[in-house]
Amino acid sequence: MIKVWIDTDVGGDIDDALALLLAMSSKQLEIVGVSTVYENTLARARIAKTLLALGGKGDVPVYVGESTPLRATYVHTIPLDINRLPKTYEEDVFGNAVVEYNAVEALHKALNTYQEINHNVYT
C-alpha cells in the first residue's frame, strides 16, 4: 500500500471532498494523516474528520493547519477571513481534529515515521 498524507482545503469546492473519498476507497492507498489549510482550518478539519468517519476511516488523524500562507503573499482579491466557515453546511459535523500538534509538526513526524510516504505535491 502507498502511504499518503492529504493536505486539503476541504469544504470549499467539491474537489477536495471527492479526492478524500477516492483516496479512502482505494485499495492501493493508506491515508496516514490529513491536514487542513486556508481560512477556517478548524472547520475544515472537522469536515475532513466527518468524511473520514463516514467512510469508515475515523482512525485517521486530522490536523488543523495554517489559515494563511506561511511564505507567500495572499493574492486573491477577496480579503482573507480566517473565521469564515467554508461554504454553508447546515448539518452538524461530528469530527474532532487533533490539536496536540499543528499540521506542519504532524506532517514532519509522519515523514520521519513512514519513510515510504508519498510526499509528492499535487495541486
What are these regions (language model features)?
Residues 1-123:
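N-terminal acidic, glycine/proline-rich low-complexity segments
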